[in-house]
Amino acid sequence: MLGLATTVTLESSGCSSKMCFRLLCSVSSRPARGTFVEDACWVYIISHTFFPFNMTWRVVNIFISLSMDGALMEIGPYRLQDDHTLIYNNGSWDEFANLLFVDQPVGTGFSYVSTDSYVRELGPMADQFVTFLERWFNVFPEYERDDIYIAGESYAGQYIPYIADAIVRRNEKLSANGTSWNVQGLLIGNGWISPLEQYRSYLPFSYKEGVLDKNSDGAKAAESQLSKCMSKLKEVGKFGVHVDECERVLELILDTTKVDGKCINMYDVRLEDTPDACGMNWPPDISLVTSYLRRPDVVKALNINEDKTTGWRECSPGVGRNLQATESVPSVQLLPGLLERGMPIVLFSGDKDLICNHIGTEDLIHNMTWLNATGFELSPDVWAPRHNWEFEGSAAGIYQQARNLTYVKFYNASHMVPFDFPRRSRDMLDRFLGIDITSIGGDPADSRIDGLKGAPTSVGAHPNSTTAEEKEKEKIKIAAWEAYYKSGEVALVVVAIAASLWGFFIWRSKRREKGLEYKGIYPNLESFSSASLATFRGKRRGRMDVESAPRPDEAELETLYNAAEGSDPQDGEENFSDGKGDNEKAQSHAGMGKSR
């Protein structure tokens, strides 16, 4: 599997987390099923869809993510429909990156423990993840020298810095013949990173968004509880990833919204939920994904270890009860060291999330000191400017950057930004990876920063993308039926049009592939593609059924390339895969899933 980026995406949520460590048990891209005596984790890898054949070297990135709700509801290549058919996700992160989804900590998702060996602290969690990666690279040595990016949301704000720090320490202790792992960047969305700033942000955010009336009795009760919270935080000192007295502040805010059998959704304050859930039933796809991942045929297709006796669930009570992190320092204390080592980090926030809201993220940046300056300070009393983003005529958000740290705020987005805006989030990723669409082919997106166009990006618009392929197929289908209505000669017209259009597509795409060269771009010229919130909250109509449209793999693309160069393809060179899957939502308040 060759690619331009392999990204490891980590998921977790308010009820549990998903990330794999300790024992590599089952890998969907390999047919064999592993067997281990103790705990077992589960991983899912999705290879990129585009590879420049004329490249003589491999510039490959691994993107690690915490697991299946991120894969099927956010950044993976497919989304589920109500009838359990799969449709392409126009905005998936696998176009220029290999995605590695990992159920972690052990006990989440498809991973399991055979004893009461749940992880209890963040340090051991990170060490176990390093053990997982070592075993992963033993099985897939072709990936070990790739660039690695680690991404997640919510409680992954704790996981990701700990994992990155553990990898840095592992590299420092390497023997002379060991292979250093190339962690090139971190992306954390609506992250639970600094409990102090996040707990303090609940009331200001609630007042600003109209969730709570500042003069109400509920506000007074919450303000009183916040005072108790601050006292407790002083008592625990540097240890305070989870503080019960502070959790009560959010509970009181939510209690005030329980009216007429409804409660505000803490992950998207524009929405409501049942009073016993207040957002835990969201997003609407979660019940669909759960039932899909419990189907026996899906479990078998995903190569799940037969020792796993319970069905997939988003939140693991066992993990949540045990991962209290009472002796772990909040990950915000690790960020300065990572930034000072030159590691680029992106913190991004959907502005309608309450539980890990953007005010808390902005405050933690403002109060954090790294590289001899505080916050986004460029020099004494001079601060990095906030740049306005505009995409296709609409305001998309803002970004701000200084000293290896980039902050991105997405307008009108929830706790799960890629769920709301898959194309915008993918555009952010492309900017971070340094993808320049002009060197690949495809139509650049109309993306502007402070009214000026930056380096062009495009989501799904280069000729080899799954989106472009589906558009070509749709053109063929429409043209064929128009011919049928005119003449009734269906078979002849379909063959003629399909041959001509597909031949033109191959010719055009292969001409664009000649001389491809990837140019890095400065990541602060990031932009976003548009996809409205309603796009994936509705029924997502008008997309094609992926189960009837297999995707060509690299062998097929190389066959087409050879054909375009005048060589005859050999019989049997075309291979197709019907890969299914991808995710992330901070679970039980943990990594791409719900929070904490």
Swiss-Prot record:
Glycans are attached at N54, N90, N177, N367, N372, N404, N412, N464. Residues 1-17 form the signal peptide. It is an enzyme of class 3 (hydrolase). It catalyses: Preferential release of a C-terminal arginine or lysine residue. Its EC number is 3.4.16.6. One of its GO terms (cellular component) is membrane. Gene3D superfamilies: alpha/beta hydrolase. Residues 543-554, 577-587 have a biased composition (Basic and acidic residues). Keywords: Apoptosis, Carboxypeptidase, Glycoprotein, Golgi apparatus, Hydrolase, Membrane, Protease, Signal, Transmembrane, Transmembrane helix. GO terms for molecular function: serine-type carboxypeptidase activity. Residues 508-596 are cytoplasmic. Its main location: Golgi. Residues 447-469, 539-596 are annotated as: Disordered. It holds the Pfam family Peptidase_S10. It is found in: Golgi apparatus, trans-Golgi network membrane. The chain crosses the membrane at residues 487-507. It is a single-pass type I membrane protein. The active site is at S154. Residues 18-486 are lumenal. It comes from the Eukaryota. PANTHER family: PHEROMONE-PROCESSING CARBOXYPEPTIDASE KEX1, SERINE PROTEASE FAMILY S10 SERINE CARBOXYPEPTIDASE. Belongs to the peptidase S10 family. Protease with a carboxypeptidase B-like function involved in the C-terminal processing of the lysine and arginine residues from protein precursors. Promotes cell fusion and is involved in the programmed cell death. This is Pheromone-processing carboxypeptidase KEX1. It comes from Arthroderma benhamiae (strain ATCC MYA-4681 / CBS 112371). The gene is KEX1.
